[in-house]
Structures are given as C-alpha cells and as structure tokens.
Amino acid sequence: MKKILKIVLLSVLGLVIVAGVLVWLELGPLLKGANSCVKLDDGLYYMEYRGDDGFEGLMAKGGFESADQLASHAIEFLSKGHYKPEVKTKKDGYGCSALTVSTADGGVLMGRNFDFPSAIGVIMHCIPDNGYETITTFNVEFYGFGNDFKPEGFKNQYMCLTGLFVALDGINEKGLAIADLMAGDTVQTHQRTSKPDLTTTAAISYILKNAANVAEALKLLDSIDMHSDIGSAHHYAMSDASGRSVVVEYVDNEMVVVESPALANHYLCEQKLNVGLTEGDDRYDRLCQRINQTHGVMNEKQLTETIAAVSQPQRKGFLGTAWTMVMDLSHPSVTYYSLRHFDKPFHFELGR
C-alpha cells in the first residue's frame, strides 16, 4: 500500500512539475518582466522585459487601427490567448515639447517633456528576441485600467506589460529617438490602403525596434497605415545619432516631413504652419531662442536646464509635466525626471 501511494504521489508530483515547466515556457518572460517593476519616484516606474515582444504576431494580423483594438490584442498576448477582453482607452489631450542639440565634441542629445492632465509613467526597457533594444515610456492611464491604478502588486504590474505595444517616446540602442506630441488641432489621420495598420503610439514601439536612424524610420512610417490615437492630431519629433532631426506631421492623410530640431504643440509644415499656436504659449520660441544663442551646441546640463525651462507646472485639472527625458543619442542612454523633480535623475543605458 505504501509503495502504491508513493508511486501515485511521485506521479502527481511529476505532472505538477511538467505543468509548471509548460507554464514557465509559455509565460516565464512575462512573469519575470512583471516582477521587475519598481517605483522610482512619485508618478514614475521602471520595468524590464526580455523575450518575444508580440510585435511579429501583431503585424502578421495586419496591425490594428484603433487603440481599443490594440489594447485587446495586448491583453490577449499577455494571457497567451486565454483571455480576450473588451478594452476602452481614455481620450485626453496632452501637450509636450522637444529639442535636439549637438555637443561640443560632436555628440547628439535630445530632450523631451511629456505634459498631460494626469499620468503615471512606466519606463519599459525591452530587449526583444527580434529587433533593437529600446527604452520607452507610456502612461498607464491611457488604457483606462481604473481610477487610482498604480503599477504595484503583481496583477497590476503584469497589466503594465501592455507597454510593450505602445510608447509615447523612447530611444533605441542605435541612438534613434522619437517623441509623440499633440499637433495643434483635432483632425485625425486614418490612412486606409492595403498596408498594415498601426496607431500613433504603437508605431513608435514598432519603429524603435526596427529602425536604426531617421531615414529608416521614415521608410517604416511610409510602409504602414497611420491611425491617430485619442481622437486628435499628432506629430513626431525624431532624431538620430548622426544629428539629423525631423518633425513628422500628417495633412489630409499624407505624411509631411520638416527638418527641425525643436517642436511643441503647433504645426510646422507649410500646409498648416502655426495651426494650434495659442496666445501666450512661447515654449517653441524659447527653445528656438536658446538654439540661436548657443548655435545649437549644449552639454547635457545645459539641455536639461533648457528643456526644464519650458516644462509646465501643475494647475487645476492639469498635472503639468509628468516626465522629462534627456537622451544621449551618440552613447545611447536616457536620464528621466518625474514631475519636474530635476534634483532626482534616473539614468539608464542601452546596449547591455
């Protein structure tokens, strides 16, 4: 009897071990990624993921043209098909500013403020099986996970892996950097051809994992159908390690590229020049003034001071600048500041 019981228990234990191995093989990288989430400062968290980032599967489906569809795909990927939810994303407008400069020794730096009515930022450091290593940021409130949601506790941390599919800004190991900013009006872009569909924020993740420089990024943008997030117009600030800096805008569903080191929340292209520029908003002018004063040459401290000077304070109904990034494109790395806490830098490097 004891021998039979021992055999049964060993058999059950063997099945449990096999089941555990199968679960780990399927979910291991995701579980490890979720457990990596740590709080850096008020309103800012960091997590790291290594493995299949889900983008090959997304593109194989032809992409998605809405944030809700993309969010549902993200949750399905995280559950490995065992859960298929209906997700409703939030639609709030946001501000922002960006500036790219050179250093005295020929390097390239890019600064960026993300301004939003409310936000909790999660830094996603992704080392994908296929593609470039990236460090990106997203606002978890974008997905509408619920009031007072924070990336704390395993369940919430796991949900934050949706950030694999969306980014508001970021840099890759090749020194390509991109930031998404509101463009100044509510005219949406919805390109509908036979190309794969991506939303504004999904395209950032896709480009950073597949493009080494601005030229390659523009080719990738031309290879997809762009769809506006949050029911509004967007434009990209995009720079690379060579020093090329462009603004990508969309007019009548056509991509327009403008060479510019600075950007805020109004159009720069000739077709809609200054649309969205409001009285009293001098952030863009102040950035351009600093470029002229310095001839576009600054060190990291000077760029940080410059981008901090156009950050936005909190006011009623508006959080202000949720996070600031200062990126080194020549030696790919990024320093974050949360909620204008410019005395509390958080530095991360790529190419590990």
Residue ranges and their predicted role:
Residues 208-211, 216-219:
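Short N-terminal edge-element motif at the start of the domain
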Residues 5-205, 209, 298-352:
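N-terminal mature-domain region immediately after signal-peptide cleavage
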Residues 220, 228-229:
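Phosphate-interacting basic helix/loop segments used at nucleotide- and nucleic-acid interfaces
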Residues 263-306:
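Charge-rich, low-complexity intrinsically disordered segments
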Residues 122, 189-192, 219, 247-251, ...:
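A short secondary-structure junction signal
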Residues 231-272, 278:
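Extended amphipathic alpha-helical segments with heptad-repeat/coiled-coil character used for oligomerization
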Residues 113, 174, 181-183, 239-241, ...:
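Structured loops at beta-to-helix junctions and adjacent beta-edge loops in soluble globular domains
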